[in-house]
Amino acid sequence: MVEPGNLAGATGAEWIGRPPHEELQRKVRPLLPSDDPFYFPPAGYQHAVPGTVLRSRDVELAFMGLIPQPVTATQLLYRTTNMYGNPEATVTTVIVPAELAPGQTCPLLSYQCAIDAMSSRCFPSYALRRRAKALGSLTQMELLMISAALAEGWAVSVPDHEGPKGLWGSPYEPGYRVLDGIRAALNSERVGLSPATPIGLWGYSGGGLASAWAAEACGEYAPDLDIVGAVLGSPVGDLGHTFRRLNGTLLAGLPALVVAALQHSYPGLARVIKEHANDEGRQLLEQLTEMTTVDAVIRMAGRDMGDFLDEPLEDILSTPEVSHVFGDTKLGSAVPTPPVLIVQAVHDYLIDVSDIDALADSYTAGGANVTYHRDLFSEHVSLHPLSAPMTLRWLTDRFAGKPLTDHRVRTTWPTIFNPMTYAGMARLAVIAAKVITGRKLSRRPL
């Protein structure tokens, strides 16, 4: 975990370049991040403080890359920090409500997508753009949730929280990228947000994991930010347990993607793979770096990672190098300072509810304000939309400064049996219809 005093910008001279801005280019097919000069930071950027905007541009967004959205979107390349304290640059896409007047204060939500892949086709800054070729990216569908937040009258920051290399599963640094993306949004003159803006975090599944790292890091890494609440939807609390749970199942592609990414963050893991993976296994991990999430799930359905090793899988998982990785990537190393709402399905086939029970207990024992919705009816995919009305109401209360209720530790009543869920889902259906037809969103708070 990075100590604030170890940041490169803390000892170097501040980068004093003026960030250049690119005006909107309509109907232009976006380049992949690996080929797009916008993503490459200028010389000397490492001396900038985290959250400094290095360049910006206006972009068109489109649902599934095809249906243009009538929203104002600005992308910011900004300086941030990786898990080892080294400077890097990544991008956030900031969307501002159409009716927001210059200088007007509105809440800012950092929405973390379930990128869940190394391929830059899945990065929000690419996948959300008009004419993006991102078939198989989960990110494109999440424009519906982002639009629901915009309809509340909130500005939304959507960071590439896996960083420029798509290192899914790496600890700590997703939180730094989220927090520095918020700083960049507040610092950007182009975006025009007030410094007094209250801030919320929201993400589900892989996005919930990134949101959890941000919630855990913000007290020490970004005490300057007024983060009033964080919603952690089905975060991956224990990657080691999840690997064992999903390996060999229809969703085996997900842990395989994580291993493909983590070998780039942990030299010890890379060494174990080099020594024990067969040629087919090494070739597969290389191919996974270019696959979208859906591609990987289809290709790896039912595959057992042990089939690509020269020793039993459990022996490999028990090595000091792999044990260190799984221990390091487990949530709960710090206690969130803002109030958190944790949402988890009891019958989740992807994330074991016991992992999230343990995480909630750890946060509560550490003194965090935890509201835990432990849903008895839903499963992994359905709980995200079904819990969205509850999430939006909870965030609205945090932005309004309302006190938390006394009964905030754990609820089990299924969202599907709550009448307010249906009113909220009806509202979300109207928003989804407007997104799918490319119509302008009007403010429709719950």
From Swiss-Prot:
Give this protein's Gene Ontology molecular function annotations.
triacylglycerol lipase activity
Q: Which domain of life is it from?
A: Bacteria
Q: Which InterPro entries match?
A: AB_hydrolase_fold (IPR029058), Lipase_secreted (IPR005152)
Q: Which family does it belong to?
A: Belongs to the AB hydrolase superfamily. Lipase family.
What is the name attached to this protein's record?
Probable inactive lipase MT1628
Which GO terms are recorded in the biological process aspect for this UniProt protein?
lipid catabolic process
Q: Which PANTHER family match?
A: LIPASE 5 (PTHR34853:SF1), PTHR34853
Organism equals Mycobacterium tuberculosis (strain CDC 1551 / Oshkosh)
